[in-house]
Amino acid sequence: MEEKKEKEILDVSALTGKQKAAILLVSIGSEISSKVFKYLSQEEIESLTFEIAKLETITSELKDNVLLEFKELMMAQEFIQKGGIDYARELLEKSLGTQKAVDIINNLGSALQSRPFEFVRRADPANILNFIQQEHPQTIALILSYLDPQKASFILSSLPTEVQTNVARRIALMDRTSPEVVREVERVLEKKLASLSSEDYTSAGGVDNVVEIINMADRKTEKFIIESLEEEDPELAEEIKKKMFVFEDIVLLDDRSIQRVLREIDGQELAKALKSVDIPVQEKIFKNMSKRAASMLKEDMEFLGPTRRKDVEESQQKIVSLIRKLEEQGEIVISRGGEEDVLV
């Protein structure tokens, strides 16, 4: 029985992807593995930690086979980035043989199919901006909808103001994009890139997508886009605003939530954030502080004197980010006026 188990564990092809990842992380050591974890989600970290805990004795042969497969996959990815799948297959066939090349490309296939615009995601945002700003707004909208919100937000904020609203509107109205369209845009942006083999429509864009992007933009960009959309498409603007949270919306928080937020905020940051807001917003904050704390905050606001609008908006953005984070964690509730927010 033990002999059979030993024979099976030497066969890399019998291992799952998670088991291979666990063996790889153990093989490269804790110092490098901890750096890898920084790029993983909490769920992925927990899953891999569980797999590592389940590992028994790892033979040298098994470890070497896993490391070799990882090396081959990394080599294939590098070739694909340089010249596409055909180029990668040609080089792999020359160095590893036809069958091995086919196996490696097949292993990478599913990942390539599910990640359009991979080469754009790896690029520096400033380079992407230079790369796409002359493109049609619909093309820009398609590309931004596939990027992570932080990178997309930087690019959207950096576009000419007359283009920002157009692009944001197109992202919000985007529903499903044909793989043929995605492939065509990819061909224009990169001469050789792995084409999508799936004929299913890929979801990208939509109101939630544009809200996430705008939420990460600076206040000036956020305000400009919303005000412009209110003129061009009031219904869409209203739908977006319902899903957004801006600093002035702090009045929508119940007292318990505001008190929870205040525990996390630096006093000087809060003083700056309140400098230019309406009295009702300030009063909502003061109401949820002790008299002494409220008095100290008012003194801090007066002591600050004239403050650059940019600094005020940065402080407001930090607090908004904290509020959104606490809402995601379920620690506070933001009432947006929907039926789901009604207390019973």
Curated annotation (Swiss-Prot):
Keywords associated with the record: Bacterial flagellum, Cell inner membrane, Cell membrane, Chemotaxis, Flagellar rotation, Membrane
Pfam family, one: FliG_M
Keyword ATP-binding: no
Part of the EHPQR-motif, annotated site positions: R170
Any single biological process term in GO: bacterial-type flagellum-dependent cell motility
UniProt keyword annotation of Cytoplasm present: no
Subcellular location: Cell inner membrane; Bacterial flagellum basal body
Broad class of where this protein is predominantly found: membrane
GO terms, molecular function: cytoskeletal motor activity
Coiled-coil residues: none
Motif interval(s): Part of the EHPQR-motif: 135-138
Membrane topology note: Peripheral membrane protein
Gene3D superfamilies: 1.10.220.30
GO CC field: bacterial-type flagellum basal body; plasma membrane
Function: FliG is one of three proteins (FliG, FliN, FliM) that forms the rotor-mounted switch complex (C ring), located at the base of the basal body. This complex interacts with the CheY and CheZ chemotaxis proteins, in addition to contacting components of the motor that determine the direction of flagellar rotation.
Family affiliation: Belongs to the FliG family.
Matching PANTHER family: FLAGELLAR MOTOR SWITCH PROTEIN FLIG (PTHR30534:SF0)
Name recorded for this polypeptide: Flagellar motor switch protein FliG
